[in-house]
Amino acid sequence: MTEEATTHRRRFLGRMFGAAAAAGLSMAGTATRAAAQDAGADDWIKEVKGTHKCLFDFPTHNNGMPLLHIFNFLNTYTTAYKTAAGQAGAVGTLYSAGQKSSIPLGFNDAIWTKYEIGAYLGLKDAAGKPYTRNVFNSPTPNDLHLLLGALNSPNIPALSGVMPAMAIPSLQKMGTKFILCNNALGLWCLELEARGKGKAADIDKELRANLLPGVTIVPAMVIAIEKAQEAGIRYNRQ
């Protein structure tokens, strides 16, 4: 491909993504944008406590492996480094779109049931049925096969106890802040509309009303990652 052709392709993709992002942003509504501005787009950074802080960047869910890595980070500081409570903090990023994305992790069981998120992500319970609940919000020892599947590993019963420990609420209590990309949310709503799940604007409104507690929507993940580094939060790509 010539340099001229490459440049043309980049411009085309840029315009296409820009149009999609703009459409997604428009669905947020004036009230939502105003509320976000009043609250401060970067106020979430203040919720990341401690002297040891790291952002875990995971656009894909990878069967929950990024959550395990966050747990490992926080737990190791406590157990091996004897760090006092509140001295280690983490950030988890929920964004992207498509059937491997991490963005569905930010929503409650009602959304997972209505939009058949388990089937959408290709995640099945121990009985082989698609999950109808957000398994990453309330995992049990019986969900260990998800992690082991990501590792292509046979069953290791001794690891089953880690599943409840890496639940989103558990990680939040340990010092993790989860953020969700507004631009990616708009794109995902358009995707769900294309899949016949309803009108994108209606989907957007419902998703925002069913966020997990403590999850904050940020204007753009690419900016949030930059802002985190400016604030001294380390970066870990998953």
Language-model regions, residue ranges each:
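N-terminal secretory signal peptides and thylakoid transit peptides that target proteins
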Residues: M1-A20
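C-terminal segment of N-terminal export signals and the immediately downstream linker at the start
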Residues: A5, M27-H52
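Loop/turn elements at helix/coil->beta-strand transitions in domains of secreted/extracellular proteins
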Residues: T51-H52, G86-A90, K173-K177, A231-I233
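Solvent-exposed loop/turn segments at secondary-structure junctions
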Residues: H61-N63, S96-S101, F178, N183-W188, ...
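Histidine-anchored nucleotide/phosphate-binding helix
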Residues: G64-T83
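Acidic helix-start/capping segments at beta-turn-to-alpha-helix junctions
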Residues: T83-F107
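A glycine-rich helix N-cap at a beta->alpha junction
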Residues: A110-G149
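Glycine-rich, aromatic-bearing surface loops/beta-hairpins
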Residues: L180, L192-Q238
